[in-house]
């Protein structure tokens, strides 16, 4: 019984260290066996260990890395966002409705878009629409929007073809809002609408003075790429009046930027845009839709803060701030309250997907015995030896800092003297091994309670951390981690009761030094290393990369010709059964070669030619078979 209590207490500390409760929104957790689980059902029934899903996939000959999608989580996110706005509307007694418009750029995968639309299939009144930002996306949503509310919002730069396609959408029975991003688009829309005999539905994107903070702050503000200034907005009104087309302007749109961490920035932007809406109404524009764009954030690190990886508000608070602000401004102006639209793609999709892969090897520092330098070793190395003796024989906290600084200085000098030929390779090897042992002991003896020790401990933690080589490409599967330093929760899937054993950093298998994760969720902050159970080469060691359902797979690139991973759709049944409903196999080597226009048929001919010329006849078939197997195989590592 006592062991059970101790185990539970230990796991509670581990759960706190990984901050799982806060970033997971209840969809993921650590069970009492130290296993990561998923709980995707709306009734919260059944906690399914992720490692069991991997075992079922292996039985189907599907190896990691694999992206696992949970459509039940997508359904829950749709309902949660809509419910938050519906609650805010009811509380405020707001006399209009809310629409959740999904911008498919966030994740255009068919399995994702179909499930989002299916989430409201049984509802008589649907609160879903779709957004397109390009011609290809528009052509996709024109065939899908009838499964939602038939509302389509068209953003992005537009040419004649784009505009004609949007207008054709009206003929297909959709409500297509063509959002003007620049003045020249207005002439195109009016001309093509007349040509097709269609009354257009126009929207106008406002370039606000308000600007958020964070990685995407350039999306808002007066220098933003998109949107019309106040004077340009008035020019649009004047032109529409002149053409007797003012009633075609039906929507006001703004976008402060993705991942808005501070609710005050959201409120300020909504307030400014709501005043644009009311001013345009007073000028005679019959605008009835108010589109707040994206920005609803994800709490990637679980700190509920204003950091760019977090958010200092919840769903209900977000909805209340928008509804209340729009309502209050409309009351001030005595204008009708519009339909509210949000384009909350990141919040909708991020939680539903997990990338799972395996650790294929590690590099671990193991303390070695420090040997006394030989008599002919230089004075510099003897200085390092004295530092080790002082540390080994015991010293006070202040001296620990001095030993650290001396060792840093001595090691730098060793590298300098080796580069100029003063020291030998043997000298350098001794110095590096001795310094590592000194660092190891300093890390053990220093305390986080001493504020002067803390920055040194951070440095030592990085220096001594295990290197975990994980079978994935950061550039393909987590491009935002590399490109904009986005933090994603990363956890081992098993053995978490021993998570404090080691600290590690995750490295991918690309031939690029940037292929490393530099920041990890750890308690109430971000650390440069991750607490992990020790690696055992005799047992599979699985890592999970969470909250990767938004943007990552569509932004991923083909560095080193690593392609898309396998992806699967998993639903959890009423009895807790794991239903693998769809498997999309990842790219083969041949797929990737063809993508970069390598003639694979010629490759095969070259193989045959080389084999026939260079390989003994009895080996030729075997060699050709292995080469062919390589072409048809997964781009990731499989054979261990």
Swiss-Prot record:
GO terms for molecular function: arginine decarboxylase activity; metal ion binding. Its EC number is 4.1.1.19. NCBIfam families: PRK05354.1, speA. It comes from Vibrio vulnificus (strain YJ016). It catalyses: L-arginine + H(+) = agmatine + CO2. The gene is speA. CDD domains: PLPDE_III_ADC. Its cofactor is Mg(2+); pyridoxal 5'-phosphate. Substrate binds at residues 290-300. The modification N6-(pyridoxal phosphate)lysine is found at residue 105. The keyword Hydrolase does not apply. This is Biosynthetic arginine decarboxylase. Belongs to the Orn/Lys/Arg decarboxylase class-II family. SpeA subfamily. Keywords: Decarboxylase, Lyase, Magnesium, Metal-binding, Polyamine biosynthesis, Pyridoxal phosphate, Spermidine biosynthesis. GO terms for biological process: arginine catabolic process; putrescine biosynthetic process from arginine; spermidine biosynthetic process. Catalyzes the biosynthesis of agmatine from arginine. It is an enzyme of class 4 (lyase). Disulfide bonds: none annotated.
């Amino acid at each position: 019984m006592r062991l059970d209590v101790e185990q539970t207490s230990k796991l509670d500390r581990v759960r706190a260290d990984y901050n799982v409760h806060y970033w997971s929104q209840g969809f993921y957790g650590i069970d009492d066996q130290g296993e990561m689980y998923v709980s995707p059902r709306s009734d919260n029934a059944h906690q399914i260990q992720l490692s069991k899903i991997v075992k079922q996939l292996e039985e189907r000959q599907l190896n990691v890395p694999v992206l696992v999608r949970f459509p039940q989580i997508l359904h829950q996110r749709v309902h949660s966002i809509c419910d938050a706005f519906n609650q805010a509307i009811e509380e405020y007694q707001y006399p209009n409705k809310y629409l959740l418009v999904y911008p498919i750029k966030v994740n255009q995968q068919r399995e994702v878009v179909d499930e989002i639309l299916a989430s409201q299939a049984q509802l008589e009144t649907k609160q879903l629409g779709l957004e397109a930002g390009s011609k290809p996306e528009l052509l996709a949503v024109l065939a899908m929007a009838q499964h939602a509310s038939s509302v389509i919002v068209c953003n992005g730069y537009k040419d004649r073809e784009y505009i004609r396609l949007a207008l054709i959408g009206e003929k297909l029975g959709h409500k297509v809002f063509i959002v003007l991003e620049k003045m020249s688009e207005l002439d195109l829309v009016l001309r093509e609408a007349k040509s097709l005999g269609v009354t257009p539905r126009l929207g106008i994107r406002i370039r606000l003075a308000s600007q958020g903070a964070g990685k995407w702050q350039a999306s808002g503000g007066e220098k933003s790429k998109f949107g019309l200034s106040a004077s340009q907005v008035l020019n649009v009104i004047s032109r529409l009046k002149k053409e007797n087309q003012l009633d075609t302007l039906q929507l006001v749109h703004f976008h402060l930027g993705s991942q808005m961490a501070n609710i005050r920035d959201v409120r300020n932007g909504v307030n400014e845009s709501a005043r644009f809406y009311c001013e345009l109404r007073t000028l005679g524009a019959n605008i009835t839709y108010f589109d707040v764009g994206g920005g609803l954030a994800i709490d990637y690190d679980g700190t509920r803060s204003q950091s760019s990886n977090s958010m200092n508000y919840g769903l209900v608070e977000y909805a209340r701030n928008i509804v209340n602000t729009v309502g209050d401004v409309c009351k001030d102006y005595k204008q009708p309250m519009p339909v509210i639209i949000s384009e909350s793609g990141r919040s909708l999709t991020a939680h539903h997907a997990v990338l799972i892969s395996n650790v294929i090897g590690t590099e671990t520092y193991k303390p070695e015995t420090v040997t006394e330098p030989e008599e002919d070793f230089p004075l510099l190395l003897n200085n390092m030896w004295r530092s080790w003796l002082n540390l080994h024989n015991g010293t006070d906290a202040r001296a620990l800092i001095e030993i650290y600084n001396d060792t840093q200085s001595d090691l730098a000098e060793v590298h300098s003297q080796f580069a100029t030929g003063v020291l030998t390779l043997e000298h350098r090897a001794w110095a590096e091994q001795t310094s590592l042992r000194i660092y190891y002991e300093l890390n053990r003896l220093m305390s986080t309670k001493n504020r002067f020790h803390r920055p040194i401990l951070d440095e030592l933690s990085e220096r001594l951390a295990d290197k975990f080589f994980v079978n994935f490409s950061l550039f393909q599967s987590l491009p935002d981690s590399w490109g904009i330093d986005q933090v994603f929760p990363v956890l081992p899937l098993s053995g978490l009761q021993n998570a404090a054993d080691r600290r590690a950093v995750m490295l991918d298998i690309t031939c690029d030094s940037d292929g490393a994760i530099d920041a990890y969720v750890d308690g109430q902050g971000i650390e440069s290393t991750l607490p992990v159970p020790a690696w055992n080469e005799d047992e599979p060691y699985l890592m999970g990369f969470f909250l990767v359902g938004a943007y990552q797979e569509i932004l991923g690139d083909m560095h080193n010709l690593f392609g898309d991973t396998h992806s699967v759709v998993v639903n959890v049944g009423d009895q807790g059964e794991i239903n693998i409903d769809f498997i999309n196999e990842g790219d083969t080597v041949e797929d990737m070669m063809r993508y970069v226009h390598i003639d694979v048929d010629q490759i095969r001919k070259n193989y045959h030619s080389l084999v026939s010329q260079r390989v003994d006849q009895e080996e030729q078939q075997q060699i050709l078979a292995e080469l062919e197997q390589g072409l048809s195989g997964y781009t990731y590592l499989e054979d261990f």
